[in-house]
From Swiss-Prot:
Binds 2 Zn(2+) ions per subunit. Pfam families: HAGH_C, Lactamase_B. Its EC number is 3.1.2.6. The gene is gloB. The keyword Zinc applies. This is Hydroxyacylglutathione hydrolase. It comes from the Bacteria. Its cofactor is Zn(2+).
């Protein structure tokens, strides 16, 4: 399979996974126009859409795409039923698309019904995990989001994290505000700055590398714990996650 990305809105990525025959699955099409343009340019044959959650910038293009390709199956959690989903999916489900098996797991936090789609090495994680960060808690609790991130963190080292937004630079600036002397984060910051100056995307990222620079995956890291302890003593990693998320919300 081949991974492709389509920029949308200000900072969204619509991921498109294609096979050698040109059949494809489209992930979180927030708008239809750029997808239709890419389909025409590459002569792709859309087979399915994956929806991770109900927010408009992830589902806004579904109904128009279905008008052009009514044969498509649209997979999504229950919260996307009125957004164009034709087949509802949830935690533990497996589906076969493009001849490949995808496993779904619930990742509540950003929204209560958020799901991720995984077919090694590709993880389509919507707004749950970003490079250097994680999604805002619009509906879920810090505990829910922490558990969702731990599910992702348990995946193989070579998992490709296909997040839905280009938030990396801002996330790494936040990480440096907490751990300014961390060598991994500083090195990644320089790399990300260079990419963004050239208008190049920073995604996808490899989970093994993400574990080194994403503070939300490092809640048991001694350097981070020592930094948090300067302000408050938090014994549980979930509590440290909540502290981090609160800091990021006002950064």
């Amino acid at each position: 399979m081949n991974l492709n990305s389509i920029p949308a809105f200000q900072d969204n990525y619509i991921w498109v996974l294609t096979n050698d025959e040109g059949r494809c699955v489209i992930v979180d099409p927030g708008e239809a126009a750029p997808v239709l343009k890419a389909i025409a340019e590459h002569k792709w044959m859309p087979e399915a859409i994956f929806l991770t959650h109900h927010h408009h910038d992830h589902v806004g293009g579904v109904k128009e795409l279905l008008q052009h390709f009514p044969q498509m199956t649209v997979y999504g959690p229950a919260e996307t039923q009125d957004k164009g989903a034709t087949h509802l999916v949830g935690d533990g489900d497996t589906i076969r698309v493009l001849g490949e098996k995808f496993t779904l797991f619930a990742t509540p936090g950003h929204t209560l019904g958020h799901v991720c789609y995984f077919s090694h090495p590709y993880l389509f994680c919507g707004d749950t995990l970003f490079s250097g960060g994680c999604g805002r808690l619009f509906e879920g609790t810090p505990s829910q989001m922490y558990q969702s991130l731990m599910k992702i963190n348990s995946l193989p080292d070579d998992t490709l994290i296909c997040s839905a937004h280009e938030y990396t630079l801002a996330n790494i600036k936040f990480a440096l505000s907490i751990l300014p002397h961390d060598s991994f984060i500083n090195e990644y910051y320089r790399k990300v700055k260079e990419l963004r100056v050239k208008k190049q995307m920073t995604l996808p990222v490899i989970l093994k590398n993400e574990r080194k620079i994403n503070l939300f995956l490092r809640t048991e890291d001694i350097d981070l714990i020592n930094e948090i302890n300067k302000e408050t003593i938090l014994q549980q990693p979930e509590a440290r996650f909540a502290w981090l998320r609160s800091k990021k919300d006002t950064f």
